[in-house]
Amino acid sequence: VDTEAYKQLRRVEDNHWWYRAAREQAGRLIDRFWPSRPRPTRVLDAGCGTGGTTAWLARYGSVIGIDPHPDALLATSARGVPVVRASADALPFRDGSFDLVTSLDVIYHARVQSPQASLREMRRVTRAGGRLLLRVPALPILEGPHDRFVHGVRRFRLGELRRELRLAGWRAGWAGYVNALLFLPTLIARRLLPSSAGGDLDRTARFGSVFLGMQQLETRLLGRVPLPIGTSLLALMENPPHPGSPE
């Protein structure tokens, strides 16, 4: 992600319908599938961007953000969130340092050479019994100009994501498509409408109340009704005990 993309993200992240809905989805998944989580929770946001979601995660406990880009770190630290310059595939923390690691729309970036290596590294710094909250863009058919604007180079099918998580050692969780109601509008827009040099965030803002309502409707069903398609994949996975570690 370059400086222009970070500027746009910082400008819209707090109130844009996409990020508001994404935070609601994340909260729903955590509350539904991890009610017994530690309180407070030690949280690492691996790929914090400009910090809107990182600051939101502080409701669960103490949170630290990491990102390799100076613009991201500056924006996140301005929110009062501790930050460290690092990449998801080389985290400067001891084994088992966190109860929850979040990585939201990160491992699809060009900067991430191996999603599986990053998922393994996130598992290393998560305590046994801790969780990973992961979101990635879904379905290669939806690839479009916005992906290129944010330097996204991969989209995942559900089976592919489950395989990556399994091979990285994550177990016993929930993973599935989200934003099914956005699938057709997104496909049509990316196939028929002229490309936007600044990605999708600005040009979809005018429909914010409609799209937010669509996503909030789906959020009520999250974890109850499996969706066959969606524009994103969301997962909450458990880190099983490492060999030789206590249960």
What spans do the regions from the language model cover?
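Conserved N-terminal segment of class I S-adenosyl-L-methionine
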Residues: V1-R94, L100-L104, L119, G230-L233
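Short N-terminal helix/helix-N-cap motif within the alpha/beta-hydrolase-1
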Residues: A55, R111-P115, G144
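Short catalytic micro-motifs in class I SAM-dependent methyltransferases
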Residues: D105-H109
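A short glycine-rich, Lys/Arg-flanked "PGG" loop and its adjoining helix->strand segment in the class I
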Residues: Q116-R131
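Conserved S-adenosyl-L-methionine
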Residues: W170-A180
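A C-terminal cap/extension of S-adenosyl-L-methionine-dependent methyltransferases
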Residues: L182-E247
